[in-house]
Curated annotation (Swiss-Prot):
GO terms for molecular function: cadherin binding; identical protein binding; importin-alpha family protein binding; microtubule binding; protein kinase binding; syntaxin binding. This is Golgin subfamily A member 2. The gene is GOLGA2. Keywords: Cell cycle, Cell division, Coiled coil, Cytoplasm, Cytoskeleton, Disease variant, Golgi apparatus, Intellectual disability, Membrane, Methylation, Microtubule, Mitosis, Phosphoprotein, Protein transport, Transport. It is linked to Developmental delay with hypotonia, myopathy, and brain abnormalities: An autosomal recessive neurodevelopmental disorder characterized by global developmental delay and muscle weakness apparent in infancy, microcephaly, seizures, central hypotonia, and skeletal muscle myopathy. Brain imaging shows cerebral atrophy, thinning of the corpus callosum, and delayed myelination. It is found in: Golgi apparatus, cis-Golgi network membrane; Endoplasmic reticulum-Golgi intermediate compartment membrane; Cytoplasm, Cytoskeleton, Spindle pole. Changing residue 987 to A: Abolishes interaction with GORASP1. Abolishes membrane clustering. Homodimer, may assemble into homohexamers. Homotetramer; forms a parallel homotetramer with a flexible rod-like structure that can give rise to I- and Y-shaped conformations. Interacts with GORASP1/GRASP65. The homooligomer forms a complex with GORASP1 with a 1:1 stoichiometry. Interacts with RAB1B that has been activated by GTP-binding. Interacts with p115/USO1; interaction with p115/USO1 inhibits interaction with STX5 and/or RAB1B. Interacts with STX5. Interacts with ZFPL1. Interacts with AKAP450/AKAP9; leading to recruit AKAP450/AKAP9 to the cis-Golgi. The modification Phosphoserine is found at residues 37, 66, 273, 438, 690, 937, 953, 981.
Amino acid sequence: MWPQPRLPPRPAMSEETRQSKLAAAKKKLREYQQRNSPGVPTGAKKKKKIKNGSNPETTTSGGCHSPEDTPKDNAATLQPSDDTVLPGGVPSPGASLTSMAASQNHDADNVPNLMDETKTFSSTESLRQLSQQLNGLVCESATCVNGEGPASSANLKDLESRYQQLAVALDSSYVTNKQLNITIEKLKQQNQEITDQLEEEKKECHQKQGALREQLQVHIQTIGILVSEKAELQTALAHTQHAARQKEGESEDLASRLQYSRRRVGELERALSAVSTQQKKADRYNKELTKERDALRLELYKNTQSNEDLKQEKSELEEKLRVLVTEKAGMQLNLEELQKKLEMTELLLQQFSSRCEAPDANQQLQQAMEERAQLEAHLGQVMESVRQLQMERDKYAENLKGESAMWRQRMQQMSEQVHTLREEKECSMSRVQELETSLAELRNQMAEPPPPEPPAGPSEVEQQLQAEAEHLRKELEGLAGQLQAQVQDNEGLSRLNREQEERLLELERAAELWGEQAEARRQILETMQNDRTTISRALSQNRELKEQLAELQSGFVKLTNENMEITSALQSEQHVKRELGKKLGELQEKLSELKETVELKSQEAQSLQQQRDQYLGHLQQYVAAYQQLTSEKEVLHNQLLLQTQLVDQLQQQEAQGKAVAEMARQELQETQERLEAATQQNQQLRAQLSLMAHPGEGDGLDREEEEDEEEEEEEAVAVPQPMPSIPEDLESREAMVAFFNSAVASAEEEQARLRGQLKEQRVRCRRLAHLLASAQKEPEAAAPAPGTGGDSVCGETHRALQGAMEKLQSRFMELMQEKADLKERVEELEHRCIQLSGETDTIGEYIALYQSQRAVLKERHREKEEYISRLAQDKEEMKVKLLELQELVLRLVGDRNEWHGRFLAAAQNPADEPTSGAPAPQELGAANQQGDLCEVSLAGSVEPAQGEAREGSPRDNPTAQQIMQLLREMQNPRERPGLGSNPCIPFFYRADENDEVKITVI
């Protein structure tokens, strides 16, 4: 209750004090507003917008609040004009207007526009009536108290103008509300269009998600298959590793067994795990063996060439021997013919001596003289032939000496010998031709008819002829002696031939020594062959192990190929999974942001609804207080009528009035403090509202609000979205597919719902922000009327504000707790994402390792294929060489048969005369019997070859059979009884079942 004054105050003093107090209060309010207006952070955008009749001092802060300024904004949310009561008990016009505007906004949300208009008009009319009543009361009280009409009328005019301004502001707020309703309709249409677009986008998203689900199902199936194959591959790998370990043990056993034969093979078997080094060593060893084989082939080729040269030399020497034998036989025939001629001449001489008469003595003498000349010429020829034979003998001896030297010097000297022998052969052939001509002449002379018988009785001529015949006989005897000497010379030549044969035997012995050396070489080759057999066995075992290892490698290659395919499929699946996860993360982040914004908006709406309820309660309280004030004013008016009679008493009680003024000042200070506290709380609430809703700066700033909304949406899209939390108990792909489908569907539903809620909350927040802005623009202070009811109203509003602040604090704590929980959830999801990325990195490392192993195996396989191709090429080349050698051997056998035929023909010519022709075959046979050679005697034994010369095939030839037998013995050197006198060919051959010659490669 208001305190009752004991004495009425002086009118002049009370009016002056009232005006001074009002001026001081206005100044303090302005200073307070100026102090509170820079509470917005620096860089914020401030706008002063003066509406129709509104107070130009009211400003609206529309700056964007940063997260660092949220506590300040929360502290600066409440304004002092919303819920304050002046000390005089009259509610401030700003508070009433804000409460009425809030009620009108609430009614506009629920009731059509016509009801809003009627309510606004009724409220303005009621305000005007109240203002008129107050003006009348104030005027009457002023006129009754002191009669100062003009001052009180001026104050009343000020109040009327103030109330008119408030009414104009109310009309403008109505107009703005109407405009806001129009904008709300437009926004509803836009919202409908956006919802239609969202539905279309949802349909498209559903279609895309259906395709993605199918792909995801296929990928999950493939992942399951890959996992099963991975398990199978791991088991197969374990088996292969176990088998490889067993093989390693076996290889170590084999290495210990083969260590005594070949250390290299043992090293290769012990180092079975290091296949690459083993293969390189084996390649090196094979290269060394091929080099040794090539060296042996070169030596063998050189030996064969030397043997062929020796055979050619031997054949040439045999031809020379044959020529000499034929020349010797021809000379013997010539000697026999000469003996026959001598006998014939003796018979003729006897006939001439027996017959005395010779009618044709002159002719006979001439014939005898001619015969003598012929005999002398023949004798000279024979002497020349003897000399030539001696010269040839000397040359032959020199040639034999040269041959021994040539054997040491080999090919060059042998060619010179062949050249000299060819020259000698030509000379001897010329001599033989001369002898043949002489023989033909003698035969012609023998074929002439005998002369007629001479008359009996020797004459002088006959005696002369007889003397000449005796002389001729003597000459013939001398010739016979010369022939005997020549025969002796021939015997010497035969001795020389024997010596030459001995030398040939020595050469054959040297050849035998060479053969023994060849045997030693053969033994070395046998040892090498034994080593090679052991090596071949080891290599066969190694080859088997390599084949097994190749099988393992091929299986490993298959496994690696399958693993590569699996890993590629896994990579594609993981890529698709990542994309789906990113999309789901984006959707979930959008949903979370939408949820947060919807929660914030719902919280803001709840807080605004609470504030609206509080404002309505305060408005009702203010109406009740106003009614009380009007009743009290009537009572006071009656008291003022009574107090006119007590003016004197009031003058006496000035001191009491001063005390009352001081109490009013104190109450004004208390109300100012309460106003400051309320403004701080209002600023805090306004900061919370600006943080939650980001409303516009003032009245009708839809474009800036839309820009803020677009910025919020862009920030929601640009924020990195967490990965979806995939539960760990999803073992089957069906469960995973169902989980992803449900997650996508729920995300879409929540996204659509939260978008709708966000739009609704934004609309509500805009409305509330406009209402708050319009309410904040109203004047916040009025002149306090003297009374006694202000303390109770201020206490109730303070308690209501305290309750609202406690609710806001509790809600703020709940929001902070939810935010902390969400942060923990986000951190957990990020941890899961990091784990998934680590697993994908390990899978990528496994893939890289598989690829490197696969590349190494491919390189090894390629090297093996190249090595096999080189071996096949070498094999084909060796086959071609073997065919060429086989043809050469067959050609040698054919040449041998031809030489056999020649020797047989040469041996059959002197067979008719056993006395003279016997020594030649005996000599040839001696040459065969004395020479136990290791090479093929191409001259051969004449006696067994005579009966078999007609057979042309080399299979029926005993020498060829001997060659084949020797080849078999050479192939199996341990089973060979010995060389003996069997000839051999210095090549390595193999005879098959058909006795065909094939060269084997060691």
